């Protein structure tokens, strides 16, 4: 890294609807709705406000099958009014929801910490090498069908790791560390590479900005060693509201942007996505 000459990391281009990410494209800005994803009209109106304020992607919480299915209606509502913004489905815990969302959203976010592995319970703290390998095979067996759905529907994905939701399996081997967060992400990226699926964006977030910055830098180093150049989504989880949240987000995101890292930024630190 050259401290005196800015150089942006070269990444692969990812197709997300009509708004590509990474590669030669500018750093994209996105925000997230805080409306119920089952409320079509409320989501459409808030998404329009995000776009009018400069947002290039709109992310929606997608807790269940009903929310995933309603993404179709939200998409129709936006496009009927001339808003072609790509929608991003934010999925947790249930891979079946991701399968449905991939049919209607332009991008689907999954969390490696709870996509296949059970939520963190601390009930199983030790895994043999054989057990560990079996769990990774389970991820492969469940993740590949999802990738095939995404290929069929031209849907991109974001592999989004959160510091607070690492699985028991990762915790058993790496602890609550940047290395554990990176490996949680890399397990999924390696499968994407094996399956020749390249429309992938990645994120690693933590509420502690120091941990977040250190982990993203480590991830980039590991990816480069394995010949990967996937684009980065930057954000600080649980940044907080108001001025404190904006300062915290700016510190974490700004440090990485100054390193030349980052292809899109998620900003949502106010009650309404458009509020200052």
Give the residues covered by each predicted segment.
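Single conserved hydrophobic/aromatic residue that forms the stacking wall/gate
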Residues: 268-276
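N-terminal amphipathic alpha-helix/helix-capping segment at the start of soluble metabolic enzymes
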Residues: 1-30
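Glycine-rich, proline-tolerant flexible connector loops at the mouths of alpha/beta enzymes
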Residues: 55-74, 114-123, 130-131, 203-207
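Active-site mouth loops of central-metabolism enzymes
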Residues: 27-42, 88-89, 171-180, 240-245
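Active-site-adjacent loop and "lid" segments of alpha/beta metabolic enzymes
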Residues: 169-182, 230-259
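Alpha-helix-loop-beta-strand connector modules within alpha/beta enzyme cores
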Residues: 68-87, 141-149, 222-226
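Glycine-rich tight-turn/loop motif centered on a GG-T
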Residues: 106-142, 169-180
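Conserved, mostly hydrophobic/aromatic
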Residues: 29, 90, 159, 202, ...
């Amino acid at each position: 890294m050259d401290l005196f000459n800015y150089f942006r990391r070269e990444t692969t281009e990812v197709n997300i609807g009509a708004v590509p990410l990474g590669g030669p494209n500018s750093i994209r800005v996105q925000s997230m709705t805080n409306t119920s994803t089952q409320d079509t009209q409320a989501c459409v109106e808030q998404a329009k406000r995000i776009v009018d304020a400069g947002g290039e992607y709109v992310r929606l919480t997608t807790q269940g099958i009903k929310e995933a299915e309603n993404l179709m209606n939200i998409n129709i509502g936006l496009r009927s009014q001339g808003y072609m913004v790509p929608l991003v489905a934010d999925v947790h815990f249930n891979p079946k929801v991701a399968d449905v969302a991939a049919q209607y959203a332009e991008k689907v976010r999954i969390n490696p910490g709870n996509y296949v592995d059970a939520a963190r319970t601390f009930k199983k703290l030790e895994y043999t090498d054989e057990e560990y390998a079996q769990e990774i095979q389970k991820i492969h067996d469940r993740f590949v069908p999802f990738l095939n759905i995404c290929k069929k529907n031209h849907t991109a994905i974001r592999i989004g790791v959160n510091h607070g939701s690492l699985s028991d399996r990762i915790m058993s081997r790496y602890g609550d560390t940047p290395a554990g967060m990176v490996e949680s992400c890399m397990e999924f990226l390696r499968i994407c590479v094996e399956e020749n699926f390249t429309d992938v964006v990645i994120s690693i977030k933590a509420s502690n900005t120091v941990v977040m910055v250190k982990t993203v830098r480590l991830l980039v180093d590991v990816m480069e060693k394995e010949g990967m150049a996937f684009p980065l989504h930057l954000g600080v989880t649980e940044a907080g509201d108001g001025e404190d949240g904006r300062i915290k987000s700016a510190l974490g995101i700004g440090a990485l942007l100054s390193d030349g890292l980052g292809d899109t930024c998620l900003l949502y630190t106010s009650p309404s996505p458009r509020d200052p």
